[in-house]
Amino acid sequence: MKTSLSLFGIEDEIKQWLKEDIGSGDITTLATVPAGSTTRAIIHAKKPGILAGVDLAREVFHALDPSLKFTAILEDGAEMDATSVIATVEGDAQAILTGERLSLNLLQHLSGVATRTHQLAELIKPYRAKLVDTRKTTPGMRRLEKYAVRVGGGANHRLGLYDAMLIKDNHIKVAGGITAALDRARAYAGHMTKIEIEVENMDGVKEALAAGADVIMLDNMSADRMAECVKVIDHKAVVEASGGITEETIVAAAKSGVDVISVGALTHSVKALDISMDIGEIKTA
């Protein structure tokens, strides 16, 4: 899926990641690779999947050596097979080897997110439900992981605690109930702020609907119970299914008629896609 990633501020993040990895110096590369030598490396997939993170890989190599020639063969969103060539990097051999791990870490992780998202999004494609992520992201990586979700064909839930309200069970307990929580949220929020509330049963649905929730999250309900709730809500609020959604249950959830299906596993426990880098002949100065 075609989407865009803002690289604003990414240079600082990449420098921090490189500092974490390199420390005072890449002692293995410094010891084994002659200074001034050059090479050409090929980055390629070893498993089928959806590509994400090419621009980040380029930024990693350019942070180490701006003169490196990074040529992207594929763009983010490309469907890869087990032999797809993603990019080539030419130039200083020490810089290429030093940047290998970080660039691959980013490509593997983000492509893993995009691939898993694509797999689930394809399952519910015949239905109206939209697949979205959650805030269950890796600290410091949220905007990148949420970008990868978009690349894979999903959409983003709220970006953080600041752009939408989601009243969960603990908020409801502290506030004194569903109606009280929604009343307080509505009094606090601006007119542009959407308010979502989590409910666990039909009584909660009816109370949330009467109290004016914009979005009602059906938490850990069976598909049959979700379908009953959808009928009661009757388009008066957006309906989200959440909690325990898996590859085995997502189609049933979509068939229930919900508008949105949120899956934390898109980001919190995704398997990295196998991507590798092969070094060509080393040419000494």
Give the residues covered by each predicted segment.
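C-terminal active-site rim and adjoining tail of enzyme catalytic domains
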Residues: 220
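Short acidic, glycine/proline-enriched helix-loop-strand junctions
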Residues: 235-238, 281-285
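Cys/His-rich Zn2+-binding cysteine-cluster or related metal-binding knuckle/ribbon modules and their
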Residues: 247
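Structured adenosyl-cofactor binding patch, chiefly the S-adenosyl-L-methionine
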Residues: 271-283
